[in-house]
């Protein structure tokens, strides 16, 4: 079972990219589980046909300790197993702590046991690595390979670099490695070349360049992944390609984060700062 975590700047399209990629893996016949690690609880909606899933923490709050696996895991597109950790009530408590509680409960209830024949577990993690709770999949060895969703925008690259610092910090203890950058295009000038160069300097690869296409939003409005909504569309092939590249990936590295000056010089070199 491969344990994958998807990180990236808030709003970069992690949940969309994760769900569309998982749909590609499921179409290949892979058995996948998706764990949403975001209080917004939107990491599995497209796989479940738009259903807002009841989160692990909400279920715990309402039902106490008497929780069964079927209470917190729902079957989605092509038998993907979907769960959302959820978070505390707004303004109260720590969302990162909620992720730790949820993942530990899933383990206790046997969500990762051999009987499920899982090929992949995907953790879709909120925003940058800003606190220990959100770093938990990296820190505690829950995830073994990380993919960072980014774009050619400065803050997305800055966040990607920060996440690499988090991976570096826990690489020895947790055994986690970076599998590559996924460029979720924002149509920035020289975007593909810039992210390829960023990946090279960090010591990794740009595993796939996902072109920007409004069809992704159209599929979302219809509460589906692109592959589910229109399997013949060109954008569906992009996500299939990304799924195949992740499935075939053999390049797992401890990243070499850049100094802020190096990052800024990269932006200047490729024209974004002009």
Swiss-Prot record:
Catalysed transformations (reactions): N2 + 8 reduced [2Fe-2S]-[ferredoxin] + 16 ATP + 16 H2O = H2 + 8 oxidized [2Fe-2S]-[ferredoxin] + 2 NH4(+) + 16 ADP + 16 phosphate + 6 H(+)
Cofactor names: [4Fe-4S] cluster
Cofactor details (free text): Binds 1 [4Fe-4S] cluster per dimer.
GO biological process: one example: nitrogen fixation
Pfam families: Fer4_NifH (PF00142)
E.C. number(s) listed in UniProt: 1.18.6.1
Keyword Chloroplast appears in the UniProt entry: no
PTMs per UniProt: The reversible ADP-ribosylation of Arg-97 inactivates the nitrogenase reductase and regulates nitrogenase activity.
Enzyme superclass (EC): oxidoreductase
Entry GO MF terms: 4 iron, 4 sulfur cluster binding; ATP binding; metal ion binding; nitrogenase activity
Positions carrying ADP-ribosylarginine: 97
Binding locations of [4Fe-4S] cluster: 94, 131
Keyword DNA-binding assigned: no
Keywords: 4Fe-4S, ADP-ribosylation, ATP-binding, Iron, Iron-sulfur, Metal-binding, Nitrogen fixation, Nucleotide-binding, Oxidoreductase
Annotated residues for binding of ATP: 8-15
Subunit structure: Homodimer.
Family classification: Belongs to the NifH/BchL/ChlL family.
Function: The key enzymatic reactions in nitrogen fixation are catalyzed by the nitrogenase complex, which has 2 components: the iron protein and the molybdenum-iron protein.
UniProt name for this protein: Nitrogenase iron protein
């Amino acid at each position: 079972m491969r344990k994958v975590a998807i990180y990236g700047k808030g709003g970069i399209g992690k949940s969309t990219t994760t769900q569309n990629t998982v749909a590609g893996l499921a179409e290949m016949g892979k058995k996948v589980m998706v764990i949403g690690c975001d209080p917004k609880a939107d990491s599995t909606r497209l796989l479940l046909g738009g259903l807002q899933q009841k989160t692990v923490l909400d279920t715990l709050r309402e039902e106490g300790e008497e929780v069964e696996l079927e209470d917190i895991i729902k079957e989605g597109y092509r038998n993907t197993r979907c769960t959302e950790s959820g978070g505390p009530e707004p303004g109260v408590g720590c969302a990162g702590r909620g992720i730790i509680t949820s993942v530990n409960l899933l383990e206790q209830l046997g969500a990762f046991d051999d009987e499920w024949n899982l090929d992949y577990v995907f953790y879709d993690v909120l925003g940058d690595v800003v606190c220990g709770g959100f770093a938990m999949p990296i820190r505690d060895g829950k995830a073994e390979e990380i993919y960072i969703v980014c774009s050619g925008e400065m803050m997305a690259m800055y966040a990607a670099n920060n996440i690499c610092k988090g991976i570096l910090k826990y690489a020895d203890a947790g055994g986690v490695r970076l599998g590559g950058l996924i460029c979720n295009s924002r149509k920035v000038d020289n975007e593909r070349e810039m992210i390829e160069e960023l990946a090279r300097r960090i010591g990794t690869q740009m595993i796939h360049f996902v072109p920007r296409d409004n069809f992704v939003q159209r599929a979302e409005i219809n509460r589906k992944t692109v592959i589910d909504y229109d399997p013949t569309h060109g954008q569906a092939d992009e996500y299939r390609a990304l799924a195949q590249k992740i499935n075939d990936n053999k390049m797992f590295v401890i990243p070499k984060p850049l100094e802020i000056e190096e990052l800024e010089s990269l932006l200047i070199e490729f024209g974004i700062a002009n």
